[in-house]
Amino acid sequence: MSEKDFVQVAKLGKTVGLKGYVKLHNLSDFSSQFKKDATFFIKNTKEMLKIKHYNANNSTVLFENYEDIEKAKELTNLILFQSIEKSRQTCKLKKDEFFYFDILECEVFEEDKRLGKVVDILETGASYLFEIQSDEKWVEKKYPKIFFIPYLGKFVKNIDIEKRQIFCTQDAFLILENS
């Protein structure tokens, strides 16, 4: 598996207490994946960490073989990764919900006009913004290289993950024009 087959799910913080617990900063929308016996990869290593105990109330986690404070300090600031395949199995989506990794690189259209492709997703509190890298033909016409479309029904009509396409309303091109 290559690096593109994995997704960041958490960052580990400082130790908490004396028994080896560390603060877990969830980088995903799925806290349910952090449970006893769940395993995660550490970037640039083949080492896997297995959860011995997870406390959802204070977002602390204890990993097997790191059950004392000195050993647990080695985990501070590490990023945990999960395979995309395992994420699909363990993280259940509701209707009209999508994984970030499925949205990224999708082409964005308004009717038959290709506006660009999604290069990032920003959380703005109550909603999300798709960061769109404009299609080269729009850049050549002096439109911005980057613009943002809110992930709201007013702007996004349909997302087709299998075709890697997002279809927008007429307001999407207005956003590009006025960015």
From Swiss-Prot:
SUPFAM superfamilies named in the record: PRC-barrel domain, Translation proteins
Q: What Gene Ontology cellular-component terms does the record carry? A: cytoplasm; ribosome
Note the InterPro entries from the entry.
PRC-brl_dom (IPR027275), PRC_barrel-like_sf (IPR011033), RimM (IPR011961), RimM_N (IPR002676), RimM_N_sf (IPR036976), Transl_B-barrel_sf (IPR009000)
Major subcellular location class: cytoplasm
Which segments does the entry list as coiled coil? none
Any one GO molecular-function label of the UniProt entry? ribosome binding
Where in or outside the cell is it found?
Cytoplasm
Q: Keyword set for this entry?
A: Chaperone, Cytoplasm, Ribosome biogenesis, rRNA processing
Keyword rRNA processing assigned: yes
A biological process from GO:
ribosomal small subunit biogenesis
In this chain the PRC barrel domain maps to 95-174
What is the documented function of this protein? An accessory protein needed during the final step in the assembly of 30S ribosomal subunit, possibly for assembly of the head region. Essential for efficient processing of 16S rRNA. May be needed both before and after RbfA during the maturation of 16S rRNA. It has affinity for free ribosomal 30S subunits but not for 70S ribosomes.
The record's domain comment reads: The PRC barrel domain binds ribosomal protein uS19.
Subunit structure comment from the entry: Binds ribosomal protein uS19.
Q: Which family does it belong to?
A: Belongs to the RimM family.
Recorded protein name is Ribosome maturation factor RimM
Organism ancestry: Bacteria, Pseudomonadati, Campylobacterota, Epsilonproteobacteria, Campylobacterales
State which gene encodes it.
rimM
